[in-house]
Curated annotation (Swiss-Prot):
PPIases accelerate the folding of proteins. It catalyzes the cis-trans isomerization of proline imidic peptide bonds in oligopeptides. InterPro entries: Cyclophilin-like_dom_sf, Cyclophilin-type_PPIase, Cyclophilin-type_PPIase_CS, Cyclophilin-type_PPIase_dom. Coiled coil: none annotated. It comes from the Eukaryota. Its EC number is 5.2.1.8. This is Peptidyl-prolyl cis-trans isomerase B. It comes from Dictyostelium discoideum. It is found in: Microsome. GO terms for biological process: protein folding.
Amino acid sequence: MKVIFVVLAIVLVTLWAMPSEAGKDPKITNKVFFDIEIDNKPAGRIVFGLYGKTVPKTVENFRALCTGEKGLGTSGKPLHYKDSKFHRIIPNFMIQGGDFTRGDGTGGESIYGKKFNDENFKIKHSKPGLLSMANAGPNTNGSQFFITTVVTSWLDGRHTVFGEVIEGMDIVKLLESIGSQSGTPSKIAKISNSGEL
């Protein structure tokens, strides 16, 4: 009986001491970048770390759209973020872009075709600088994304977080400063170049 108690105590202490998976930061598997222009003037670079172990399909979509390696999409436009605009910027909320087909938030497409399903919602919108998929409801992911500028926990379970800003949060803040409550930016902000590091 003593042996069982000792073994049980050791197991419980070991389990208690093990780090929790939920408390860990997601593993960054890829790094990509956006070079930003505001009113045709270089503003700087944002570098993102992508969580490819947690949401591999979503990460592969974004990574490939950063490089443009997939060529033309079903829309006849390049599957590439280069030269696309940030069409919606709301201070104290987020910066949205990725509509390279229409430029106004009504378009975009994924490397898998028009839309793809939500992969999972394991990562929460728990801090500024997170990269998440913009969508029009469940399972409608394309190419549009947003970068949080505050905690946005009300989006948990509705939008897939797949990366974070690892360099250039000052550029994110600069973009945020040209936003409005309606979401219409006061200046033209675009991705002049994008790729993988």
